[in-house]
From Swiss-Prot:
Subunit structure: Part of the 50S ribosomal subunit.
Residues forming coiled coils: none
Organism: Rhodomonas salina (Cryptomonas salina)
InterPro entries registered for this protein in UniProt: KOW (IPR005824), Rib_uL2_dom2 (IPR014722), Ribosomal_uL24 (IPR003256), Ribosomal_uL24_CS (IPR005825), Ribosomal_uL24_KOW (IPR041988), Translation_prot_SH3-like_sf (IPR008991)
Primary subcellular site in the record, as a coarse category: plastid
Gene Ontology, cellular component aspect: chloroplast; ribonucleoprotein complex; ribosome
Protein name: Large ribosomal subunit protein uL24c
Stretch forming the signal peptide: none
Gene3D superfamilies assigned: 2.30.30.30
Function of the molecule: One of two assembly initiator proteins, it binds directly to the 5'-end of the 23S rRNA, where it nucleates assembly of the 50S subunit.
Keywords: Chloroplast, Plastid, Ribonucleoprotein, Ribosomal protein, RNA-binding, rRNA-binding
GO biological process, one term: translation
UniProt-annotated location(s): Plastid, Chloroplast
Length: 102
C-alpha cells in the first residue's frame, strides 16, 4: 500500500474532497484507510437494557486507499511517492513532484 499509518494525506474524491488529515488506521484486507476527522458517520444506537437511553455515536468510516494521496505540509503539495536508497542502502520515500524541482 502506498500510504502508512501516521501519514498526512489529502482526500481526492467524495464529500470531503480537498481536506487534509492524518491516517489513524489501515485495513490491509480491503485496501482501506481511516483518516482522522474525515468521512465522519453517525450511528443511532437503541437502548439495550431497561433504563438505558439511546445514543448517537459518531465514528470515522474507512476510505479506499486509492482516494487519498500523501501530502507534504512543508511544500503544501500532494504527490505520489517514489522509493530511493540513501548512502547507507536504506529505502526512503521521496515525493515525485519534488524530484523534478532541482
Amino acid at each position: 500500500m502506498h500510504v502508512k499509518q501516521g501519514d498526512t494525506v489529502k482526500i481526492l474524491t467524495g464529500k470531503d474532497k480537498g481536506k487534509i488529515g492524518e491516517i489513524t488506521k489501515i485495513i490491509k484486507g480491503s485496501n482501506q484507510v481511516v483518516v482522522q476527522d474525515i468521512n465522519v458517520k453517525k450511528k443511532h444506537v437503541k437502548p439495550r437494557k431497561e433504563g438505558e437511553i439511546g445514543k448517537i455515536l459518531q465514528f470515522e468510516a474507512p476510505i479506499h486507499s486509492s482516494n487519498v494521496m500523501v501530502y507534504n505540509a512543508e511544500s503544501q503539495v500532494a504527490s505520489r511517492v517514489n522509493y530511493q536508497k540513501d548512502e547507507s542502502g536504506k529505502k526512503i520515500r521521496v515525493f515525485k513532484k519534488l524530484l523534478n524541482t532541482n
